[in-house]
Every structure is written in structure tokens, then in C-alpha cells.
């Protein structure tokens, strides 16, 4: 089940725009059915896969941020198949930052989710310390 909305895609694009401005790269937003959100392009060539997670709170609201295990697996599979690194791009109300998919593997896993989606709303997630997500 795809739970991504038009609002989600707009928020992801805004996060990618900030990333592009900071690093002088291009981020191509991939189709919603693709396993990750975007591909970073450097000097006209693919350089990395990006999964975007937009939060509606400030970065200091919680000590950790969730990275879905299946998203990290997809990023690592793409990295293994292509050689392009996979990364998570987190955006909060007050800041944004990135962390590599490889680094996420070192953190504890919990089961977390949204009760408003019923049983389909829960999944295993890595508990990534917010302080480890760097600009």
C-alpha cells in the first residue's frame, strides 16, 4: 500500500531543493512507485540515491528519528547494485540533514508506526540519533 500523498511529494521536493542549494547538485525526484525518492546528480552524472523523510516537528522534539528498515534495505540494495551510495535526507521544521544508509545499520531497531493506518501502519525502524544526522 502506497501511503504517499501529493503533500508528501511537495514536502520532499522542498527538502531536495534545500539540499541542492547547499551542495550545488541536482536531485531528480523519482516516480512514486520507485523504491526510493530521488537520485542525486553531480556534474551531469548519477551520484547517490536519496530517501527523504519530512517531519512536522522541530529537530529537538525527540532524541531519535525513525528510518524504516525496508527503506534502508532498498538504499543498500541499490548501492550494492550500482555503486552509488544511499542516504537518508531528514527535514524538520528547523533544520535538515543527511546520514548514510550504511551508518543507519548500527542503530537499534524498534517497531513503530501510526495507529490511524491499522495493522498496516507498523514497521521495524532504526532509531537514528538526531545528533548523528549532519548538514
Which residues does each PLM region occupy?
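A structural signal for short, well-ordered beta-strand segments and their strand-loop junctions
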Residues: 29, 49, 86-90
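Intrinsically disordered, low-complexity terminal regions enriched in charged/polar residues
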Residues: 97-135
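Nucleic-acid nuclease catalytic cores
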Residues: 76-104
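Short acidic/glycine-enriched loop/turn segments that link adjacent beta-strands
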Residues: 32-36, 94-95
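Amphipathic coiled-coil/heptad-repeat helices and related helical stalk/stem segments
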Residues: 12, 34, 68-71
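Conserved catalytic cores of phosphodiester-cleaving nucleases, focusing on short active-site segments
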Residues: 38-58
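Acidic-basic catalytic patches of nuclease active cores, encompassing PD-(D/E)XK
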Residues: 1-32
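Mg2+/Mn2+-dependent nuclease catalytic core
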Residues: 55-74, 78
Amino acid at each position: 500500500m502506497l501511503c504517499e500523498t501529493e503533500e508528501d511529494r511537495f514536502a520532499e521536493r522542498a527538502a531536495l531543493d534545500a539540499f541542492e542549494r547547499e551542495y550545488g547538485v541536482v536531485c531528480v525526484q523519482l516516480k512514486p512507485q520507485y523504491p526510493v525518492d530521488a537520485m542525486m546528480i553531480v556534474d551531469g552524472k548519477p551520484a547517490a540515491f536519496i530517501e527523504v523523510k519530512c517531519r512536522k516537528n522541530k529537530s529537538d522534539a525527540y532524541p531519535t528519528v525513525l528510518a524504516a528498515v525496508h527503506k534502508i534495505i532498498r538504499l543498500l540494495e541499490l548501492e550494492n547494485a550500482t555503486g552509488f551510495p544511499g542516504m537518508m535526507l531528514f527535514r524538520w521544521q528547523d533544520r535538515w540533514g543527511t546520514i548514510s544508509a550504511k551508518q543507519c545499520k548500527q542503530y537499534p531497531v524498534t517497531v513503530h508506526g501510526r495507529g490511524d493506518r491499522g495493522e498496516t501502519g507498523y514497521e521495524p525502524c532504526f532509531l537514528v540519533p538526531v545528533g548523528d544526522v549532519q548538514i
